[in-house]
Design a protein with these regions (language model features):
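Transmembrane helix recognition focused on a "late"/terminal membrane span
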Residues: 2-31, 47, 52-156, 176
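Positively charged, hydrophobic/aromatic-enriched amphipathic segments
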Residues: 26, 44, 338-340
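Hydrophobic, membrane-inserted alpha-helices
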Residues: 32-37
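Alpha-helical transmembrane segments and their helix-start/interface "positive-inside/aromatic belt" motifs
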Residues: 38-54, 152-163, 261-264
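Glycine-centered flexibility motif
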Residues: 39, 49, 63, 136-142, ...
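A structural signal for multi-pass alpha-helical bundles of membrane permease subunits
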Residues: 70-73, 159-475
């Protein structure tokens, strides 16, 4: 809570400082509120002043020629439908000047974002000009344009490096995603032939409620539950498996450790989608594994144990919900453990040997050494990577999709009504909604939920992660 309150206090101070700068500034500061480059010209920063004038002029032109026409239609997202009329005189088909709802939405969001950036830029301009006034009054050195540019690649390089990726990849994608979630953009409202419009929180209500025809609420709970179970199991099974495999290979009693390590590295060299497609064929209902199991009596044994239906002549490795979930986790272990083994090998080779030797002299068993020394050290080093792996597994599209697409067919009608499956993650459900059913509105809502889950987990985990002040314990 302190960090949240501190965030809002920082915003308050930002605008307060702007008011102070404008109130206490000289005539050039106040003139900069109208002509943005005026304050820079007065302090002999000609290039900066020209840049400000160009930015201001470009913003005015953008507002008139780009923002205003689109924002005028932003409230309705268009009213003129697409129509084609055949002209018997010219024997040609003409198209009317129709509205494209998605283009209006996209252009409006971009325009609003540019306006927001300009407002922040405008405030920064006033505060900077006031700071230049104070520096001149105090006889301090005022940077030249060349010195300002150098600072962008030195002490301010982090701002230079992160600005464009943040705007282009994170902010714009998220803003469009959020906007679409409040519309009825789906297969019945596909531009340019149809228009879509705002529906408020109706899509969010659908995701958290049920009816006879709309079962998104039921499907969301089922898919979310499996997504979290999958993320936890996939992360920790490969993590622990990689550590145990690395310790086994690096053990003094293991013969030919280089050979074993090389064999597992070779499995990494094979493209993952090739491995997954081959494994899917191996475990298919008529695949080689089922053939072997049937011939040696394993299928009949599982029938007697009640693990396979009496009417089946095969083991439904990837076609039964329960079997499929177990197999997906096991196959992911096979795919993911070699990666973790390599990482764990590097960490294990850097554990201080004096700590381990001291513990053994004091009578510690191998398990105690592993649990009290090795694991804390590995968690300290790999903690951030473990968080990243968990988030990556929430969005792990390849494993689920390649193993179950065109193989697994849900028998749950409520899930089928929402185009979901028992083995779907939120991300594969989202993909199916957009790629196969063009239900962009619900896909956007699910995308927002995924983003909130990943962002919240990442922020909370990193805030509680082992901080740098404990680094000396592991040196």
């Amino acid at each position: 809570m302190k960090k949240i309150s501190g965030f809002f206090k920082a915003i308050g101070r930002y605008f307060k400082n702007f008011g102070v700068a404008f109130a206490k500034g000289d005539i050039w500061v106040k003139l900069s509120a109208v002509i943005m480059g005026a304050g820079y010209f007065a302090r002999k920063q000609i290039v900066n002043g020209l840049i400000m004038l160009i930015v201001e002029a470009a913003f005015v032109l953008m507002c008139v020629g780009y923002a205003a026409p689109n924002l005028a239609k932003f409230g309705t997202l268009g009213t003129v439908k697409f129509e084609q009329v055949f002209d018997p005189l010219t024997m040609q088909t003409t198209t009317n000047n129709y509205d494209n709802s998605f283009q209006i939405l996209l252009n409006s969001v971009v325009a609003l974002f540019i306006i927001l950036i300009f407002v922040l830029f405008y405030i920064h301009n006033i505060k900077t000009v006031y700071k230049l006034q104070q520096m001149k009054e105090n006889g301090e050195h005022i940077n030249t344009f060349k010195e300002d540019m150098k600072s962008l690649f030195n002490e301010k390089f982090h701002i230079t490096l992160l600005t464009l990726p943040t705007i282009g990849v994170v902010i714009m994608n998220i803003l469009i995603l959020i906007a679409v979630a409040f519309t009825n953009y789906d297969q019945q409202h596909l531009p340019p032939n149809s228009l879509f419009t705002w529906v408020g929180f109706k899509n969010f209500a659908s995701l958290f409620s049920n009816s006879m025809t709309v079962t998104f609420g039921y499907s969301f709970r089922k898919v979310l539950g499996w997504t979290l179970v999958w993320a936890v199991m996939a992360t920790f099974t490969t993590f622990i498996g990689g550590i145990l495999l690395a310790k086994a290979i690096n053990s003094k009693t293991t013969k030919l450790p280089k050979m074993w390590r090389t064999l597992f590295i070779i499995s990494i060299a094979v493209p993952q989608f090739v491995t997954l497609l081959l494994v899917r064929n191996f475990f298919a209902d008529s695949g080689i594994v089922n053939t072997i199991c049937s011939n040696i009596g394993i299928t009949d044994m599982l029938k007697h144990a009640g693990l396979v239906g009496e009417h089946l002549t095969y083991i439904p490795f990837l076609t039964d919900p329960h079997w499929a979930k177990v197999m997906i986790i096991l196959i992911n272990i096979w795919v993911g453990v070699p990666y973790q083994m390599l990482i764990a090998t590097g960490v294990l080779m850097n554990i201080p040997t004096d700590q381990i030797e001291s513990a053994k002299i004091d009578g510690a068993t191998n398990f105690q050494v592993f649990w009290k020394i090795t694991m804390p050290y590995i968690l300290f080093i790999q903690g951030p990577a473990l968080i990243t792996d968990f988030v990556k597994n929430i969005n792990n599209f390849n494993v689920i999709y390649l193993l179950t697409q065109d193989v697994f067919v849900t028998q749950n009608q409520a899930l089928a009504n929402s185009h979901a499956k028992e083995v779907d993650l939120l991300v594969t459900w989202l993909f199916r909604l957009t790629n196969e059913y063009y239900d962009y509105k619900m896909a956007s809502v699910i995308g927002i939920i995924v983003f909130i889950i990943c962002a919240a987990f990442t922020l909370i985990s990193f805030s509680r992660m082992i901080s740098g002040d404990k680094e000396e314990e592991y040196q």
